Amino acid sequence: MNWVNDSIIQEFILLGFSDRPWLEFPLLVVFLISYTVTIFGNLTIILVSRLDTKLHTPMYFFLTNLSLLDLCYTTCTVPQMLVNLCSIRKVISYRGCVAQLFIFLALGATEYLLLAVMSFDRFVAICRPLHYSVIMHQRLCLQLAAASWVTGFSNSVWLSTLTLQLPLCDPYVIDHFLCEVPALLKLSCVETTANEAELFLVSELFHLIPLTLILISYAFIVRAVLRIQSAEGRQKAFGTCGSHLIVVSLFYSTAVSVYLQPPSPSSKDQGKMVSLFYGIIAPMLNPLIYTLRNKEVKEGFKRLVARVFLIKK
């Protein structure tokens, strides 16, 4: 990649909420707690899913991928935010900004695709239960996960290249907590209409295509569940999908408001808060949603804790 600004720009200033210094300490506390919970929660899901043989199923394989993604998602942004909240001079190096932009875009796109893959897994499990193990074999699961990651990172290469090749005007001040495409486009010295149109188009594709697949999957799932005679069977079927639906709703509702909403000066602070929610709060809530609503994960966690104490004895 030819990052044309690399030899000129050394660093960016991240404004965040610099005009409201009284918010810095509360945000520092919130970010620190959220990051700690995110690390602990997602590591717990990864360990439980990998170490408990009863959870070696496609559903938990994809959940492990989602937890790993959320770990990386927050780690690429939160540590830098914490440092800046504790500093008088809030900066990020040019190379750090490039890395943050690339990783943030890649993981965001990958998450959309993984959520669609997880809905397909639930569709097969509920609508084709007798053929589930045949259809969702290990090789297909690996291929679906790999395709999600590769597509997400390929999309990031494209968008990052388009954004970072634009000439940027001094002062290099980003009115945000992190390096995002919309914030960087505002620094450009040239017309960015074409870039904004491409960003909008790609965002629509990565939002609407996976969302359409999710909605189609759940339309078939709801139809299949309503045919189940017993109330207990219906409750169990809906229970396996409830956590996934909550996560999808959280992620899509916030991400759509950032990338598919037309820019407005009056909504810039709202955009910052929404970005913080889907970049920090949502990855923290995901493991809580899955563990609190999922009996198998809770039982697997208990077995893991019991094994740890047994080894210590």
Curated annotation (Swiss-Prot):
Stored InterPro entries: GPCR_Rhodpsn, GPCR_Rhodpsn_7TM, Olfact_rcpt
Biological processes annotated in GO: detection of chemical stimulus involved in sensory perception of smell
Keyword Transmembrane: yes
Domain of life: Eukaryota
GO MF annotation terms: G protein-coupled receptor activity; olfactory receptor activity
Function of the molecule: Odorant receptor.
Family: Belongs to the G-protein coupled receptor 1 family.
Alphabetical list of SUPFAM superfamilies matching this protein: Family A G protein-coupled receptor-like
Disulfide-bond pairs as recorded: C97-C189
Bilayer topology term: Multi-pass membrane protein
Entry keyword Disulfide bond: yes
Compartments in which it is found: Cell membrane
Range of residues in the leader sequence: none
Glycosylation sites: N5
Main localization (coarse): membrane
Record topology, Extracellular segments: 1-25, 80-100, 159-195, 260-272
Official protein name in the record: Olfactory receptor 2B6
Alphabetized UniProt keyword annotations: Cell membrane, Disulfide bond, G-protein coupled receptor, Glycoprotein, Membrane, Olfaction, Receptor, Sensory transduction, Transducer, Transmembrane, Transmembrane helix
Chain ranges on the Cytoplasmic side, renumbered to this chain: 50-57, 121-139, 220-236, 293-313
GO cellular component: plasma membrane
Listed transmembrane segments: 26-49, 58-79, 101-120, 140-158, 196-219, 237-259, 273-292
